[in-house]
Amino acid sequence: DLSGAEAASPKIDHAAEADALKTACEASQAVCTSVLREKKTAAPPKLFDLTSLQREANRIFGYTAKQTLDLAQALYEKKLLTYPRTDSTYLTDDMGETAASTAAMLCGKLAFMEGAEFSPDVSRVLDSRQVSDHHAIIPTMELAKADLAALPESERNILTLAGARLLFAAAEPHTYEVVTAVFQCAGGEFTAKGKTVLCMGWKELERRYRATLKKKPDTDGEENALALDAPPFAEGQSFDRPAVKVTAHDTTPPKQHTEASLLSAMERAGNEDTDPDAERRGLGTPATRAAVIEKLVKSGFVERKGKQLIPTGDGNGLVAVLPDVLTSPQLTAEWENTLTQIAKGKADADGFMRGIEAMARELVQAHPNISDADKARFKEDKPVIGKCPRCGGSVYEGRKNYYCGNRDCAFTMWKNDRFFEERKTAFTPKIAAALLKDGKAKVKKLYSPKTGKTYDGLVLLADTGGKYVNYRATVSRDRELTQQA
C-alpha cells in the first residue's frame, strides 16, 4: 500500500516464499525506481452491423442472436430502423446530412441524452469504400414521430441501443494517461498502475446510457481494470514500512461461449489463414449466423444455460468423429468467399460444385464406416422410460417424443400428439412410463372437447403397429368417452 495505491509483485508459486517476502518488506523501505507515463486513446466504436448488434444485445440484455434479428426486422418493417441484414459498419459518403439529422434527433429523443453537451461529428462514420450491399444499422428519422414508450420493451431496447451506438460513434475519442511505477523493496520488484482521464469523450455518453439499464453489463478493456487517479509518483520517492499483504489466486479455465462470444468467434474464424483481400471471411453471414446457432440447439448438439452455450455429449462426439477437413473454419470461410464471388459473377459455379463432389468422393473412400469406439460416443445415456410394446427394446425420452432405441423399430409417442393437446394435458414422462408398463395411465383433469369440462380418467394405449400410436380415454371400465382412430 503506497499512498493509497497498490503495487503488486510478479506471481510467486510458493506460499512460504511469498510470506517471507511480505515479512521482509514490512521492515524495509520501498523505493520508486521508474515512472512511465503513456497517453492512450480509446477510439469511438463503429456503427452496428447485424453481428455486432447481436453480440451487444446478448451482452447487455441476454437476447439470443435470433431474437435480436427478429426484433431488428420488426423495427425495420415499422420503418424505425434501417435494413438489419448487413455486414457494414459505415454509412456511405452521401449520407452525411441524414446521419447528422438523425444524431440531432436522437439527442432530443433518447432519455439518457437529457442535459448532455454534445456536438456529433458524423464524418467519422462515413466511408463508402467500407459499405458492401447495405450500410450500417441506424434508426430512421421516422423515430422523431414515434412514441418510444408505446413500443414493446424488447423493441425499444434494440432501437435505443442502435441510436446510442450512432451517438457514441460520432463522439470524441476517450483519452487517458496510464502511469506505471516500479518499486524495489527487500529485493523484490513491485509494479503499480493507474490512469488519469484526460477527455471522457464517447465514454461519457456510454456512462449515461449504462446508467439507464436495469442490469449493468460487464465492461471490457484494459483501461477499466486500472485504478483511477494514480498518485503522482516520482523516481526516488520512498515509503517506509509499507503495508503488505499476500493474496492467493486460482487459475480459471476458459469461459464457456455466450452467443456474443460465439458470434465474434464465427466472424473471425479462419481469418488468419484466409486471404486478407477476400470479400467474405468467417463462418456464415450476418443473416445466417443466428439460424446456425438455433439449428445447433434444436439438433441437440448445444444447449443454453442462462447466457452460456454448452456443447452436449452428442455435440462433442460429433466433432470428435468428423474428419478434420469438415471441421476446418478455413475451409468454410473459403467456401463463403467463393459463394460471394459466384453471386457477383467473379467465380465459376460449376467448377466450385465439381470440387465439392470430388471432396465428397474422397471423404467417403477414406472413411467408409465408423469405428466401434466412435459409435460408443453416441450411446444413449438417458434414463429408460420403459419397454417398447412392439420389439421389447428400451424407450427413451427425446426433446419432442418418446422413442424406441432400436433403430429397426418405428415405435414413437409424440409429446405434441393431438390426443393430448385436445385434452389440454401435458404428455409427461410419468404418463408415458405408465402406458408402456401397463398399457394405461391414470390422468387427472382431462379436458373433454365434447362437454368443455374436465374429468379424472384413464388414458389407454391402443397401438396397432402402424405409423402412429393411438390412444383412448375412459372415465370407467365400461364407459368410454373418446377415442382417436
Language model features with spans:
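Basic, low-complexity terminal or inter-domain segments flanking catalytic cores
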Residues: 18, 36, 65-66, 84-485
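Conserved phosphate-chemistry cores used by DNA topoisomerases
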Residues: 1-74, 78-80
